């Protein structure tokens, strides 16, 4: 589970890169995953979460 958020489950998405001549090549968009130490149920644990979840966690604290 390298590129998956442990809170919301957000993972990679696939799409196309489109050149000026309108050629399309496949491309993978990875979520912005950060490794953060969070206290869960009184236990400090290192989790991999996306930055949107990190922002919502910081807002709730």
From Swiss-Prot:
UniProt cross-references to InterPro entries, sorted A to Z: Bacterial_rp_bL28 (IPR050096), Ribosomal_bL28 (IPR026569), Ribosomal_bL28/bL31-like_sf (IPR034704), Ribosomal_bL28_bact-type (IPR001383), Ribosomal_bL28_sf (IPR037147)
Pfam families: Ribosomal_L28 (PF00830)
Ribosomal protein in keyword set: yes
Assigned keywords, A-Z: Ribonucleoprotein, Ribosomal protein
Highest taxon of source: Bacteria
SUPFAM superfamilies: L28p-like
GO biological process, one term: translation
Gene Ontology MF term list: structural constituent of ribosome
A single cellular component GO annotation: ribonucleoprotein complex
Family (UniProt): Belongs to the bacterial ribosomal protein bL28 family.
Protein name per the record: Large ribosomal subunit protein bL28
């Amino acid at each position: 589970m390298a590129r998956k958020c442990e809170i919301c489950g957000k993972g990679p998405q696939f799409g196309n890169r489109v050149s000026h001549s309108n050629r399309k090549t496949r491309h993978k968009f990875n979520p912005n995953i950060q490794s953060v130490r969070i206290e869960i149920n009184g236990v400090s644990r290192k989790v991999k979460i996306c930055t949107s979840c990190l922002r919502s966690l910081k807002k709730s604290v």
